[in-house]
Amino acid sequence: MHPIQIVMFIMAVICLIIGLLLSNHGSTGGLASLSGQDLEIFRKTKDRGFVKILQIIMFILVVLFLILGLIFSFAPR
């Protein structure tokens, strides 16, 4: 396995764990769309504290995951 693949695998597992942690906090966060809950997309909600930090971390990890995926797919071998 290439080192970038290992890093991407670890990031994917971390994102999955964070998504599962966020799934209990409201119907707009985490993996709510996969669990079949009603999505309240247009309701005004404001997450605070630990939930907000987890959301920001997950967003950053997903963006880094996408960037690494693009770099890995276009890198010469």
Curated annotation (Swiss-Prot):
Q: How does it sit in the membrane?
A: Multi-pass membrane protein
Q: Record the organism.
A: Mycoplasma genitalium (strain ATCC 33530 / DSM 19775 / NCTC 10195 / G37) (Mycoplasmoides genitalium)
Q: Which UniProt keywords apply?
A: Cell membrane, Membrane, Protein transport, Translocation, Transmembrane, Transmembrane helix, Transport
Q: Where are the transmembrane segments?
A: 3-23, 56-76
The terms describing its cellular component in GO are: plasma membrane
Q: Which GO terms describe its biological process?
A: protein secretion
This entry's Gene Ontology molecular function terms read: protein-transporting ATPase activity
The organism's taxonomic lineage, starting at the top? Bacteria, Bacillati, Mycoplasmatota, Mycoplasmoidales, Mycoplasmoidaceae
Per the record, the similarity remark reads: Belongs to the SecG family.
- Localization (cell): Cell membrane
Quote the InterPro entries the UniProt record gives: SecG (IPR004692)
What is this protein's function?
Involved in protein export. Participates in an early event of protein translocation.
Name by which UniProt lists this protein: Probable protein-export membrane protein SecG
